[in-house]
């Protein structure tokens, strides 16, 4: 790498302060927006300190009009000894003090027709090593194709403001990351996901060398994005969240539901809990770095259920979720999706 490339890949002089300010502002904007959307619920804030260095503020909304439970966290942690999960991915960071900051959010609505949603944007530094990561994904229980397309469109547009190739990789990467291997299904309908973005190399930096995201990244070739590009990406994607989710709530919040729909929602929430406890790297990182357990596990649903050997009734609305919406799809280009959803009144 040339010296000019080295310079291009250096973080901004005030990188840590700017990254912290960005995620704090995202937390504030999202919480204010969600309180307005809910109309009744209010976030309660609890600040905490990490003995080894740093801390954060956790905000939780319970028993609102729309949201059964939701949390929006901010954390800024630092230390001298890197957790194993980081060293295994970036061994060159070993021996350096480190800094990490981010905001994360999970919302569990009451109405089964309103999807659960997750967001996370973060920044990490350790000596010469730095990167941005983040994304947002939607987990419906009674999905609609129009809702799915709207969510994806908002996040694609945000990525496109930086580079029109980003979404080509980040969308399949999301499908790959939020995948329950033991269930052979995605957690939901996806969105975007990216990690270890330091402005160099291929866009895909995940673990599945033979997957779709990796294949597309190889076709695109090496990318040269700088710190400012990636900072702007996190900002654009973070600010795309409320416009991507609020219209879905407005369309679905007054739909009536029965015990049957509620039971299915709780059953599918069990899948959400399984992913977060078994596969999620953020959970693993937080526990390995002695983060605040209550905040780390805030993403878990307030209620969930498991049922041995459950199978949805054939051709039912529940079967549509497991047959179509828990598998990676090309939501915009595959026209067969419209016909299948129309049959189940799941188009709009």
Curated annotation (Swiss-Prot):
The encoding gene: hemF
S-S bridge residues: none
Subunit structure: Homodimer.
Residue positions of the active site: 118
Function: Involved in the heme and chlorophyll biosynthesis. Catalyzes the aerobic oxidative decarboxylation of propionate groups of rings A and B of coproporphyrinogen-III to yield the vinyl groups in protoporphyrinogen-IX.
Enzyme Commission number, as recorded: 1.3.3.3
Similarity comment: family membership: Belongs to the aerobic coproporphyrinogen-III oxidase family.
Subcellular localization(s) per the UniProt record: Cytoplasm
EC primary class: oxidoreductase
Keywords noted in UniProt: Chlorophyll biosynthesis, Cytoplasm, Heme biosynthesis, Metal-binding, Oxidoreductase, Porphyrin biosynthesis
Protein name: Oxygen-dependent coproporphyrinogen-III oxidase
Binding site for substrate: 104, 120-122
PROSITE patterns: COPROGEN_OXIDASE
């Amino acid at each position: 790498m040339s010296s000019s490339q080295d310079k291009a890949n250096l973080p901004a002089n005030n990188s840590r302060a700017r990254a912290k300010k960005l995620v704090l502002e995202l937390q504030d904007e999202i919480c204010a927006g969600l309180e307005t959307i809910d109309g009744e619920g209010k976030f309660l804030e609890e600040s905490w300190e990490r003995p080894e260095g740093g801390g954060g503020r956790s905000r939780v909304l319970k028993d609102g009009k729309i949201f059964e439970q939701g949390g929006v966290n901010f954390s800024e942690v630092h230390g001298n000894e890197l957790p194993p999960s980081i060293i295994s991915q970036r061994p060159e960071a070993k021996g350096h003090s480190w800094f990490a900051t981010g905001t994360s959010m999970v919302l569990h609505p009451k109405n089964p027709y309103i999807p659960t949603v997750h967001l996370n944007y973060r920044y990490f530094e350790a000596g010469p090593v730095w990167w941005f990561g983040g994304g947002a994904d939607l987990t419906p229980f009674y999905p609609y194709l129009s809702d799915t397309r709207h969510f994806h469109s908002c996040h694609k547009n945000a990525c496109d403001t930086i580079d029109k190739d980003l979404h080509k990789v980040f969308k399949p990467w999301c499908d790959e990351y939020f995948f329950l291997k033991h269930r052979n299904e995605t957690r939901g309908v996806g969105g975007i996901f990216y990690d270890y973005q330091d402005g160099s190399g291929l866009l895909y930096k995940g673990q599945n060398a033979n997957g779709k995201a990796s294949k597309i990244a190889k076709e695109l070739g090496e990318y040269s994005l700088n710190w400012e590009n990636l900072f702007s990406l996190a900002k654009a994607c973070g600010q795309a969240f409320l416009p991507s989710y609020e219209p879905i709530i407005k369309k679905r919040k007054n739909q009536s539901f029965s015990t049957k729909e509620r039971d299915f929602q709780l059953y599918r929430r069990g899948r959400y809990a399984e992913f977060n406890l078994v596969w999620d790297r953020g959970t693993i990182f937080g526990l390995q770095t002695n983060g605040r357990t209550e905040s780390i596990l805030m993403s878990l649903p307030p209620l969930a259920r498991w049922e041995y050997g459950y199978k949805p009734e054939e051709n039912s609305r529940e079967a549509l979720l497991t047959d179509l919406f828990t598998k990676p799809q090309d939501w915009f280009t595959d026209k067969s999706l419209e016909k299948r959803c129309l049959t189940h009144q799941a188009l709009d």
